[in-house]
Amino acid sequence: MNEYTLTAIGRTTKKALIGAIKTTGYTYTAGAIVETVRDVLLKTVYGVSQIAKALDKGIADIIKGAVSAAGEVSEDTLLTLKATVKGIIKCASGVGADVGKIAVTATQEAIKAAGEVGADVGEATKQIVTGAIEAADEIGSGASKAVRNILKDSIKGSKDIIKAPFI
């Protein structure tokens, strides 16, 4: 019998299946396995969706905190937003997150924050999109192309900032 090093999800599945098989008896093993695996998968997907929601909220909170700090120490808000977006995207890459999705979320939230504090939204968009592209360029050519493409399609006004040809 093969021994595996199980992840937390694997251990949970194993324990749930053992319990289901013992509870239902061996007569209904296949049905118990199907139902248990379905339940574990649904819980896993739900957990992942909650992480994604928390990540989006966290990005918004980070950006609001950065804008607040910039105002408190009289720092350039747009420079702060550009650097914050750049940092978020590079960090996302480091933990294996979807860099394109994170770039869109961070860029949208930063542009929104700029508008809320009375900054020129057009100039903010230019600075923030530039920060996102710089981060993606530093990550690598695949990230660079993906971020440029998704921002062009997702962020109003970014097509004028992102010029072809690119990597």
Label each PLM-derived region with a short phrase.
Residues 1-167:
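Extended, low-complexity, charged alpha-helical tracts
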